[in-house]
């Protein structure tokens, strides 16, 4: 009965294993992995109303919470520690970095001592892939675009493994994040020494947003996982962007000319995608033909509103939102209204595509290469 009650809402909760009975000699004080955890997220970012309801619940439970922010921030240039220019951008173009924000007061729970101190000191901690891509070392500066287009130089305080940073490209404290225009919270993290049903009941009672899903999320791999931005850049190339109207952007001409191509595909006809899309896309479409499933790909929908290469941000975000994988030409929307039968989804999965139908914010028309 309780499970049915909890699964009637739409926030995602994951509870880490209870470690309270582990050998005390292995316990490290003030490290988040030593606590039971609930993570709360929504499609896009947390509504302000949901944020306030989480805070009310946490206050009633007398427990701990922090909010994680995220946005894509423009990178205008980088400089070495001696102020010599390292990387520059084209006129009116910027690179984009996926930046995470965290409260200074809790940073020790999530990062090693040196990284935590760098974040408190208004420096940026960056991932190894990002440091390699932009030739950055500790003491160098990234010149990011903040509010009112102000260029804000931020010193690199530490370089850490991408997995340790959560596959973001950089992390800064909340105060610095506000200067960069990062106000959205994408996740709340609640932690305590022992989390039980009372926590979930309290959250259920207080969170009024109807489109919320409360689930116990086990440590199982989602077969529709997607590549983080750092790995997308590593595999398919990095490009500068120029803003256009609304969510649309212009990608760097040199990258576009090298990577975006037109080619005739089975079933779909002429398609415009990244050059590395051809083999897996053609393989999936040929298998659909071989199994006699081509009638389930609705070509009228594909021709009217589907597509592959479409340089834009993700629609649900305003400026600062993630760059869509369509901007790399590694995602394709075919049936924009009708959906797909399970076997078609399986075929695309087998050829290396994630399907958007099982995401927190379902995108049932969408297949994305990884």
Question: Where is each model-derived feature located?
Answer:
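Membrane-interface junction motifs in transport/secretion proteins
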Residues: 13-52
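Extracellular/periplasmic catalytic domains that process cell-envelope and extracellular macromolecules
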Residues: 31-32, 117-118, 181-182, 322-328
